[in-house]
């Protein structure tokens, strides 16, 4: 509720087309850095990403008990999937989403000038990159990352990217959103994300809004709801999308791997509302990993929906 009140207060103080601070220029936001999930069994989830999907794990971080606490699954030199071996919190399996910038410190100043709560300073994380977090209107944790030349990420540049991995690119991350306008104020008006598509499965109410980062091709998918799913069901909504050139070939590759015998769920290829071929897989905790082609089935853009946003039981923080 505090998150809701804070963002409603910000909405009252800014015009619809807001340039933050007037003098503080927004640094570049270049793309999705990673998406982080809580996992109940780290070894099983590692097997899902490594044995079934073909990714590698260049490094991990240990907890106070000496056991692995966070595993880093590498998609490419700039994008990772982070697995937290910790109990899930109020947002289901979602820990946080992250975007990378060319200047984290200036981004902190920029966000602060617009009334967004930020830390007092920008420090280096355990892997050596500048980073800090903010909260969006729905209570999702959003990390801002600036890659550093002496970081673990830089150390692994050009490495641990096998040809057999199922994808080379995280196209988007998707998160549940209960009230569209506060999210648009943060992601569109403050962070500069550009809306490029709206989708509706029924034609009566809006389901998705796609927002591209201002200085790259990756995007954020806002997953609108009228009734908030319980935490154990949010893994199908809060999701990560891996781009593949041919979904049917990708599924055939997965089906041919020995690890497929351990993955008992069916993998179906279908055409989404956005008219792109896609297939969904689910990790051991039910978090959805979407495989999707970059183009529509006929090369023509899918029309954007004009359906209204749902009237939701919105509660800031997704409690």
Each language-model region and where it sits:
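Vicinal oxygen chelate
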Residues: 22-28, 30-41, 61, 71-74, 86-169, 197-203, ...
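Sec-dependent signal peptide recognition
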Residues: 2-10
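Sec-exported extracytoplasmic/periplasmic mature domains
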Residues: 50, 54, 103, 112-116, ...
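Hydrophobic h-region of N-terminal signal peptides that target proteins for export
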Residues: 10-19
């Amino acid at each position: 509720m505090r998150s809701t009140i804070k963002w409603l207060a910000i909405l009252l103080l800014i015009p619809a087309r807001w340039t933050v601070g007037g003098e503080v220029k927004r640094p570049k936001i270049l793309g999705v850095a990673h998406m982080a999930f809580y996992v109940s069994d780290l070894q099983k989830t590692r097997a899902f990403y490594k044995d079934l999907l073909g990714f590698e794990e260049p490094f991990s971080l240990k907890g106070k008990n000496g056991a692995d606490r966070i595993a880093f699954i590498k998609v490419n030199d700039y994008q990772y999937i982070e697995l937290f071996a910790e109990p899930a919190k109020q947002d289901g399996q979602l820990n946080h989403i992250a975007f990378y910038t060319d200047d984290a410190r200036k981004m902190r100043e920029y966000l602060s000038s617009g009334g967004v709560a930020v830390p007092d300073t920008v420090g280096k994380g355990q892997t050596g990159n500048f980073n800090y977090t903010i909260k969006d209107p729905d209570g999702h944790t959003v990390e801002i990352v600036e890659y550093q030349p002496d970081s673990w990420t830089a150390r692994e540049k050009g490495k641990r990217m096998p040809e057999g991995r199922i994808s080379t690119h995280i196209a988007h991350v998707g998160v549940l959103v209960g009230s569209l306008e506060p999210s648009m104020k943060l992601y569109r008006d403050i962070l500069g994300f550009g809306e490029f598509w709206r989708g509706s499965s029924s034609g009566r109410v809006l389901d998705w809004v796609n927002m591209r980062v201002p200085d790259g091709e990756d995007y954020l998918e806002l997953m609108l709801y009228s009734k908030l799913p319980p935490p154990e069901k949010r893994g199908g909504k809060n999701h990560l999308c891996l781009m593949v050139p041919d979904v049917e070939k990708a599924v055939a590759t997965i089906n041919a791997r020995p690890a497929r015998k351990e993955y008992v769920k069916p993998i179906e290829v279908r055409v989404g509302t956005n008219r792109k071929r896609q297939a969904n897989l689910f990790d051991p905790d039910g978090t959805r990993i979407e495989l999707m082609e970059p183009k529509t089935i006929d090369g023509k853009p899918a029309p954007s929906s004009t359906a209204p946003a749902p009237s939701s039981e919105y509660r800031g923080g997704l409690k």
